[in-house]
Amino acid sequence: TDHLGREVTIEKQPESFVSGYYISTSLLIALGLDDQLVGVEAKADKRNIYKLSAPELTELPSVGTAKEFDLEGCAALKPDLVIVPTKLKDSIPAMEELGLTVIAVNPEDQTKLFETIDMISTAADVVEKGQELEYWISDALESLKKSLDGVETPSVYLAGNSSLLQTAGPEMYQSTLIENAGGVNAASDITDTYWADTSY
């Protein structure tokens, strides 16, 4: 069951993936599956984490963004499994008509991040690696929490990449990162969007 509540049947262990979302791409790298990626989201060559951990990904075909996903380009890559953000829910029926197996993920808080790891590791038959990744993250968060004991909780404004007046709302994983680091998201009251426009 994916994050849209869809029951997805995977007939055989996938050997090739398309990831239309940087978080799922990063998780595929962490699970040791980057060599099975055949297509990734747009602007992969701009992400330093890819350049450092899996530079070959920057040369893969782009399947676009959540706003402009390249259905035909994705289908042409003939992946065994496509992983997309839930924002692309309206495009999934068309993907399935093209014969693609699709799971939709929304790893925008700690629980959903672990659910996404579970989904991907189960689909790829690397459950043990998925569990190891979750244990590693949990241990790191616990150590961080202990180090912050008694520290004052600051209000944090996280500016967007495209504008200093754009900030991450509480529906985004960036808000979880702020909380994990001992802060409070200054935009926590904005609940109707992901990136929110602000003014001064």
Please tell me what each predicted stretch does.
Residues 3-5, 60-72, 190-200:
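Short helix-initiation/N-cap motifs at beta->coil->alpha
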Residues 19-77, 81, 87:
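A short, structured surface patch at a secondary-structure boundary
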Residues 7-9, 91-166, 184-189:
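Extracytoplasmic substrate-binding proteins
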Residues 23-26, 43-46, 81-82, 87-92, ...:
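Solvent-exposed loop/turn segments at secondary-structure junctions
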Residues 1-12:
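Short, low-complexity disordered leader/linker segments with a strong preference
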Residues 16-20, 156:
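Short periplasmic/luminal acceptor-recognition loop of GT-C membrane glycosyltransferases, typified by
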Residues 33, 56-58, 98-100, 181-182:
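Short, structured coil segments at secondary-structure junctions
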Residues 166-196:
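Alpha-helical, coiled-coil/dimerization segments enriched in small aliphatic residues
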